[in-house]
């Protein structure tokens, strides 16, 4: 689930750079940081292996640069422990293979919290040491046994304001109401957030969503399929289905919603009302070669508000530490999915439920949308 979102963040960053929308000073800083110390290499071998280091695995591309600038270089300067970025992608299968090898080369991973929970229960992920990592620097409810939240994104309703004029949707019921809001729709291919959207539209109260009634949600979506023009798998597709006029309304990632609103000069707008907040997290592989203590110190250092501001600036990720909110410029607060004003309108995905049920629920969902 998270891998698709993270890869899309990289696409957005590349697009911003191509358009000159990313700070030249920031890119210069990144380039300088990458030259010094060659931090993008893998863990050293031989005599060089005696040097303390950590390997942090994310989804590659410009995420390597962003994570290195925001977290890796400051941590190395503070502690003398080098952080080497690996962009090969920490899928559940890859993490499992690392653990089962008996000699993992990875230390930390950018993980779906629910994946970390599942693998943690199998003994593959270290419990988060909350004597080192500070729960007070997290938003309430987003610190789990095997994963520490580091960022957020949301699934939100984006719509063509030219088609609807002054009338704007106010929640998921409007998304599913083609009489009030005529036109085609687009939804996410991999299920997350879509069950919640369907249930909210079907009258379930936000605080009564979990445990999700997957059958009810899938039935709602099945009965609505004639109005769905596409089930998108990547952010670029979710954006183009709106800008190309194929759909007049779509459930898309908040990062893409902000971008398409800017690109269309406000023709495509989005709302936070009944948005669905999804967290990202860091986790530590059991038996990591750099040591649990160093890995926990790294996670704690990543809680610094100024460092999380870099990730918001570069990748559009909502910060995990609420203290970062005050550092975001006023003209960008509307793009922060966890700004208090925006967060109050939304519902958070329940990670423990996903840890127990996502696999089976996704199988059923794929059958519905593929039929």
Where are these regions (language model features)?
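N-terminal secretory signal peptides
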Residues: 1-26
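N-terminal twin-arginine translocation
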Residues: 19-26, 35-50
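Early extracytoplasmic/lumenal segment of secretory-pathway proteins
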Residues: 50-113, 117
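Extracytoplasmic ligand-binding site segments that recognize negatively charged/polar headgroups
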Residues: 61-68, 104-241
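A ligand-binding cleft/hinge motif common to bilobed small-molecule-binding domains
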Residues: 116-120, 243, 248-266
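Periplasmic-binding protein-like
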Residues: 153, 214-224, 264-286
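A bilobed periplasmic-binding-protein/Venus flytrap-type ligand-binding module shared by bacterial periplasmic
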Residues: 156-163, 199-204, 279-292, 299, ...
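Mature extracytoplasmic/periplasmic domains
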Residues: 285-346
